[in-house]
Amino acid sequence: MSCYDGMKERFAASRFRSRFRLTQTEKAYLAEKGWNVIRAQTERIIRERLAPATPPNDGSQTPMRGHPVFKAQHATATCCRGCLNKWHGIRPGHAFSEDELTYVTEMILGWLRDQAGDLSDFPSTPDLFESAAAASNITAEPPCGEPGGKE
């Protein structure tokens, strides 16, 4: 079970979290970029906006639109340190560990994959790094650890 699958029912029960949906334009963006690029963008956004011990503008740093990852952050309560504490038990006041970064990234990617469904009807750009990833045994979905490094 993925990180997201373990929380999906809780998000669905929240009036606020359950209202987020990807638009056709956002799905087309995911298809065009591919999951490797979306993963890299997600990690960059999390490292810059959430991972520091005291993120700038915490509580209002995640826009409601502009990138599918932003929408996914609101849908999965990974939008600010307060929501991360309340929903995922990731306490504020410390920089993310690599396990916490992986957990948050996988939570967001899980929601995006769930919302995106089958993207085969959308045009896509071939991933130049996919064959290199396969050759080095890099998986598309690394195992998900518990937040805070608890395995």
PLM features: what roles do these ranges have?
Residues N57-A77:
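Immediate flanking context of iron-sulfur cluster ligation sites
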Residues E98-D127:
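Long, highly charged low-complexity segments enriched in Glu/Asp and Lys/Arg with interspersed Ser/Thr
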